[in-house]
Amino acid sequence: MNKKRDKGQSHSTRPARAGPPRWLKLDMSPSDIELLVVELAKKGYTPSMIGIILRDQYGVPLVKQVTGKKLVQILEKHGIKLPVPEDLLFLMRKAVNLRRHLEEHPKDFHAKKGLLDLESKIHRLVKYYKRIGRLPPDWKYTPEQAKLIVSAYL
């Protein structure tokens, strides 16, 4: 979905291994990690923040390597689910903030163009999530709906 950048984006490479790394010495079992994930989610942390907390405070490099399940799968198993996928939620938050800015500054044409690009990205992502089944087929992005979802969950 690289529509804007011509070059690559720097990032770290994830290790290609199935199990946990050999150097990992955890005091917790995979079920303890699952309970910790659920507890952090109930405190209001997003899945990406939970991953960062587990990495930085508990020394868990990747939840999937240790538990065998993705973090979002663990949350869904325990009945905790965001209304829309996390990346889409953050894009919607950005669009809501940009619309608020445009209400105060209607002549900001760079922001208008940014909003158009951002909403195009949201529509592409919605189309993808409908195709893979993460969103219902009749789900539609509207600025009003985005405002409600963002205010409820972020």
Curated annotation (Swiss-Prot):
Q: Which GO terms describe its biological process?
A: translation
* InterPro entries from the UniProt entry: Ribosomal_uS15, Ribosomal_uS15_arc_euk, Ribosomal_uS15_N, uS15_NS1_RNA-bd_sf
Top-rank taxon of the source lineage equals Archaea
One Pfam family name is: Ribosomal_S15
Chain intervals for the UniProt region annotation (Disordered): 1-23
Instruction: Keyword check for Ribonucleoprotein, yes or no.
Output: yes
Cellular component GO terms held in the UniProt record: cytosolic small ribosomal subunit
What keywords were assigned to this record? Ribonucleoprotein, Ribosomal protein
GO MF term list = small ribosomal subunit rRNA binding; structural constituent of ribosome
* CDD domains to which the protein is assigned, alphabetical: Ribosomal_S15p_S13e
Family, per the entry? Answer: Belongs to the universal ribosomal protein uS15 family.
NCBIfam families documented for this protein: PRK08561.1
HAMAP family cross-referenced by the UniProt entry: Ribosomal_uS15_A
* Record's subunit section: Part of the 30S ribosomal subunit.
Would you tell me the protein name for this molecule?
Small ribosomal subunit protein uS15
Which species is listed as the source?
Staphylothermus marinus (strain ATCC 43588 / DSM 3639 / JCM 9404 / F1)
Question: Which gene underlies this protein?
Answer: rps15
